[in-house]
UniProtKB/Swiss-Prot annotation:
GO terms for cellular component: cytoplasm. Mg(2+) binds at residues 57, 70, 88. InterPro entries: Resolv_RecU, Restrct_endonuc-II-like, tRNA_endonuc-like_dom_sf. Its cofactor is Mg(2+). The record marks 72 as: Transition state stabilizer. One of its GO terms (molecular function) is endonuclease activity. It catalyses: Endonucleolytic cleavage at a junction such as a reciprocal single-stranded crossover between two homologous DNA duplexes (Holliday junction). Its main location: cytoplasm. The keyword Hydrolase applies. Keywords: Cytoplasm, DNA damage, DNA recombination, DNA repair, Endonuclease, Hydrolase, Magnesium, Metal-binding, Nuclease. This is Holliday junction resolvase RecU. HAMAP family: RecU (MF_00130).
Length: 170
């Protein structure tokens, strides 16, 4: 199975969304770069190695708050928790413990739906159920469903407001 473009749909959607949000609201959200060491260049073929594990996909500031999140997608009826690497969980934990907003955006490709699950929700779910996956219906019932406003743009303003309400309620 070729995983080369795994997550590209969601990444493009988020990149377009944060570009618009940054412009409209003078926010600062950015995709993290992956450090790569280039070993060899042969015509158009570049051979390289990842220097170190990346933390999460995105980070940003808006109105004095810090946000850090990972983007994942699945074509199944559940989200496999093992899709989140241990170093990413550790990073999200540190953000959470330092009063930042740490979360994941999950895309269910088969349903064309997008959700936010906070770090705390993820940990609570796993500690309570010990399950290795989270069913789609749980996301529908428990998580913030993201609204797409323009073709290919998440309503980031609404997402941030909903996330703040969810965080303060948990």
């Amino acid at each position: 199975m070729n995983n080369k473009n795994n997550g590209m749909h969601l990444e493009v959607l988020i990149n377009k969304s944060i570009s618009l949000f940054n412009l409209q609201y003078q926010a600062f959200f950015k995709k993290r770069c992956v450090d790569i060491i280039i070993k060899n260049i042969d015509n158009s073929y570049v051979q390289g190695k990842i220097k170190q594990k990346s933390e999460t996909d995105y980070y940003g500031f808006y109105k004095g708050d810090y946000f850090d999140f990972e983007a994942k997608q699945t074509n199944k009826n559940s989200f496999l928790i093992k899709q989140i690497q241990p170093h990413q969980l550790a990073h999200l934990y540190l953000i959470h413990k330092n009063s930042g907003f740490s979360f994941l955006i999950i895309c269910f490709i088969n349903y064309n739906l997008y959700f936010i699950i906070t770090f705390q929700q993820l940990i609570n779910y796993y500690q309570k159920t010990k399950r290795k996956s989270i069913p789609f219906q749980w996301f529908k019932d428990q998580c913030i469903e993201l609204e797409i406003i323009f073709p290919g743009v998440i309503n980031f303003k609404k997402m941030i407001n909903d996330l703040k309400l969810k965080y303060y309620d948990d």
